[in-house]
Amino acid sequence: MFYGLLAAIGWGTSTTTAAIALRRARSHIVVLFSQAIGVVFLVILAVGTHAPLLSVAGSAVVALVWAGLIGLLSYLAFYQAVAIGSPGLMSAISSTYGGVAAILAVVLLGERLTGLGIAGVVLAVIGIVLAAAGPGTPAPAAAAPTGPGAAVSGRVRSGSPALAVSLALLSAVGYGVGGYLLGEYSQRSGWLMPGVIAHGTSVLALAGVLPLLRGRNGWRGLDLATLGWMAVAGLADAAALAAYSRGTQIGQVAITAAISSIYPVIPLAFGVLLLGERLSRRQLAGIVIIIAGLVLLGMA
């Protein structure tokens, strides 16, 4: 449970800082730079902890490469959804990945959840949907870009709400499948190398297709502040992934995934503490339900 909470904090921080960077840079640039920073962090962590570099079997490497590719598509889908839809609603939809990973873990890994565990997972998912899908806030693309990055972003993008929801649902399924694969192979091959392989695959794949993407020259005009936000997003994401992997190694994938999926609460907390925002009754009810779910998961 502890590592699931750490993962939630890390991914919540990453989501917040990436959203700031998205105001000034294109989504694929944010993903590539932040993921590259994350890989460097994970490699340094692996070397520093003397993680066995050859502990991952060939079949596991193939599965983790797929996990990395699925994760990359999920990141791109989510960031595009946030760019054209309500960030809160998109985060709420995407965060249901915990339920997807939990179902896969029960069906494919044979994990067993007690009645309290099942109730905790259900409450956590319901609570985060209520908490994150509160009053809509302007999407990053809806606000006029500021700073040197404004020249990079180009025209404000617009999109169908249905498209945004579809992309968020796609990211939820992708995150769930990727989270399940990462959890399964963290149990088999240690908690660091699977993340290095999956993250590394994402970076190499995106770097390979970058020349084919529209706006591939989006690096021009990026200021240090934007690069800094992207770096923080990458470090927080990698730290969250390491915590998630460790949690699934020593505990259950289903429970760790469900707990980590409460990450959208972190941006809400930043808004309340730093910006003086007020939570709606729906959001407060969602947070109470999340806490109840965490208590049940702790008792499971």
What are these regions (language model features)?
Residues 1-10, 17-29, 33-64, 75-84, ...:
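Membrane-interface interhelical linkers
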Residues 1-11, 55-71, 113-126, 190-204, ...:
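Structural signature of hydrophobic alpha-helical transmembrane segments
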Residues 11-12, 67-75, 97, 172-176, ...:
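Transmembrane alpha-helical core positions of polytopic small-molecule transporters
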Residues 21, 30, 81, 107-113, ...:
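Hydrophobic/aromatic residues within transmembrane alpha-helices
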Residues 36-42, 93-107, 201-205, 240-241, ...:
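Alpha-helical transmembrane segments of compact multi-pass small-molecule transporters, enriched
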Residues 42, 103-106, 116-135, 143-151, ...:
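Hydrophobic transmembrane alpha-helices of multi-pass small-molecule transport proteins
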Residues 42-53, 101-116, 173-187, 236-251, ...:
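Hydrophobic alpha-helical transmembrane segments in multi-pass integral membrane proteins
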Residues 78, 99-119, 129, 209, ...:
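C-terminal transmembrane-helix exit sites in multi-pass transporters
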